[in-house]
């Protein structure tokens, strides 16, 4: 089920359960997961994209292993707030994912998540090669953490 807003997503989730954050690129999918209480996002891995069915099988293996309760997809919105082809591609991925899982799916504005990930890795003094290996799932971690912080805020406001 695709949830248009974070309020809808929060309502569709069970009280506890890990979430998966995805940073969808043309060649890779960065994957991050939260703890079951949804406080901390941890970058997990990068899936090298092949075709949708193989990518999804790989992703669903992680979903089963980690007992994922919902998905947060990074939505690549332009700096002016408009949506371009990459955002449309992300929405199409969500529609295809929705056909294959009952888990709730929402979007999180991913503007500057890759920049933040790069900056954090530069500060950690990682080599260029290592940064290239990690950037996608580290960016997924930034995306998921933003959504987790919003969910925590909503929980405090409603509760």
Curated annotation (Swiss-Prot):
Compartment annotation: Cytoplasm
Keyword entries, A-Z: Cytoplasm, Hydrolase, Nuclease, Ribosome biogenesis
Enzyme Commission number(s): 3.1.-.-
Domain of life the protein comes from: Bacteria
UniProt xrefs under InterPro entries: RNaseH-like_sf, YqgF, YqgF/RNaseH-like_dom, YqgF/RNaseH-like_dom_sf
Primary location class: cytoplasm
An example molecular function term from Gene Ontology annotations: nuclease activity
Classification via Pfam families: RuvX (PF03652)
Gene3D superfamilies per record: YqgF/RNase H-like domain
Biological process according to GO: rRNA 5'-end processing
An annotated GO cellular component: cytosol
SMART domains according to UniProt: YqgFc
Enzyme class label: hydrolase
Family (UniProt): Belongs to the YqgF nuclease family.
Function: Could be a nuclease involved in processing of the 5'-end of pre-16S rRNA.
Annotated PANTHER family: POLYNUCLEOTIDYL TRANSFERASE, RIBONUCLEASE H-LIKE SUPERFAMILY PROTEIN
Record protein name field: Putative pre-16S rRNA nuclease
